[in-house]
Amino acid sequence: MTRAVVTVIGADRPGIVAGISSVLAEHNANIEDISQTVLRDLFAMVMLVDLSEADVSVGKLREELQKAGEELGVDVIVQHEDVYRAMHRV
């Protein structure tokens, strides 16, 4: 199974979750888990996404999510799950 971690950070505003999740849905990527919080006016979200049925590469998905993030005024980081875990190993 190919999975990615999608991290979204930026000023809180309506439509962020919808904008990011719609890009994932367009490419048959399945959101397995999601966590989000708002600290004052700062929005933060982490998604674990299954890409085994996706019709695009991780690189292309990253490009599209970053473009959507620019339109929404947020930063989007997309990493393979293994890379994410290696970077956050204690």
UniProtKB/Swiss-Prot annotation:
Q: Which PANTHER family match?
A: UPF0237 PROTEIN MJ1558 (PTHR34875:SF6)
Q: Which residues cross the membrane?
A: none
Annotated signal sequence range: none
Q: Which domain of life is it from?
A: Archaea
Which organism is this entry from? Answer: Methanopyrus kandleri (strain AV19 / DSM 6324 / JCM 9639 / NBRC 100938)
InterPro entries in the record, alphabetically? ACT-like_dom_sf (IPR045865), ACT_dom (IPR002912), UPF0237/GcvR_regulator (IPR050990), UPF0237_ACT (IPR022986)
What is the protein name for this chain?
A: UPF0237 protein MK1213
- Pfam families in the record: ACT_6 (PF13740)
Q: Which family does it belong to?
A: Belongs to the UPF0237 family.
Q: Which residues form the ACT domain?
A: 5-79
